Amino acid sequence: MTARTVGDRVGALLGADEDTVQLLGYGVYVGEEVPGASAGGTFARLCRVQKMVNPKLQLDNGDVVWGCECWWGREESVRAHVQRLVGKGRRLVEVRIADARKAAER
């Protein structure tokens, strides 16, 4: 996502493989901040250590997801991408970021 404005609608994907598309959800871009302690992954930790900001996304389901934890973009683009993948036979799976973070710790 290139130009972004606080309040822009966004979509966030955890990932996709040959069988599934893992959707974190849709929400809004809330700005650039240093990821909080709950953000998972090596890049999130690096951002905290180096005090580097990262895109913060507030999803409609209440979850806060950081750009470094997912693939994200404008809502209409993500919806179109998901539709293309599902149209090719992939199964759509909704994932909560807390569950993904726990699974990544294992």
Label each PLM-derived region with a short phrase.
Residues 47-106:
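Intrinsically disordered, low-complexity, charged/polar segments
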Residues 4-6:
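Short, well-ordered loop/turn sites that connect or cap secondary structure elements
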Residues 19-39:
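Short beta-strand-centered aromatic/proline hotspots
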Residues 38-49:
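Non-transmembrane, membrane-adjacent beta-strand/coil modules in membrane-associated proteins
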Residues 1, 18, 45-47:
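Beta-strand elements of modular eukaryotic interaction domains
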